[in-house]
Amino acid sequence: MTDPVTFTSPRPRSQFVAILVYTLQSCLPPRRLAAVLMPCAGALLFGLLARAVDNFPTAERAFANVAAEGIFALVMPIAALVIGDAVLGAEVRSGTFHFTWLTPVPIWQIVLGRWLGGSFVALVTIAPAAALAAVIAGASSTAGAAYLAAAVGSVSYVALFIAIGCITRRTAVWSLAVVFLIERLLGAALTGIAQLSPTWESRAIFVGYLDDPPDRLIREGIPQGGGAVVRLLIVTVVALAVANWRMGHMRLSGAAD
């Protein structure tokens, strides 16, 4: 007599893992990823530009000046905005976020899963592009600093844009206003705003780990290197906390007009 055959069903995914996988599969389709890669290609062009600049004593200084204005102030926030809007804002506008919001999943898991999914995409696209730009510029010694600065800055931006997506349906418009009006214009004049800006703090991370940084990139009142990393981690946690609170009070409706 043979023993009865028993069949075991595969262990179901946890709710958090399901949110994370859904974020990567559904919220970041190929067209969105292509939109992320376009500014990343721009980062490589900035690397070529730094290589062509000949009015700096070293390639490292040339790349530092170009990266500060081109990569950390333009490429990184735009690419992170595409990611941040994809993981939440676009679904809210289309009316499909209802299906996630109405599930018996804790709000904090939805927020954290969306942020981790977006951060993963940023870490494999934006940050490597910044490091590769340093190599293209002939400043390979700064590639590690460029990767770290772009990585920390982009994941902080993703958290910020998720929070904005929980506050308003016009995520892209308000996010651009935050980046270019508040961070770039007001942040250039007011150190208090720059201290909370992913753009300015990512530049400070990059500059802090350079052996011979240009004096014009060192700004008083903003921590450099590891201090800037800690500051952006705090900004990220606060942004996620705001997103968690606001998502619990969202009033969802149909697709935006």
Predicted regions and their residues:
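Secretory targeting signals
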Residues: 41-87, 94, 111-178, 183, ...
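Aromatic- and glycine-rich beta-strand/loop motifs that create alpha-glucan
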Residues: 2-38
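Alpha-helical membrane-protein architecture signal
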Residues: 13-21, 108, 112-116, 144
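Terminal transmembrane helical anchor/hairpin motif
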Residues: 3-4, 53-62, 167, 172-257
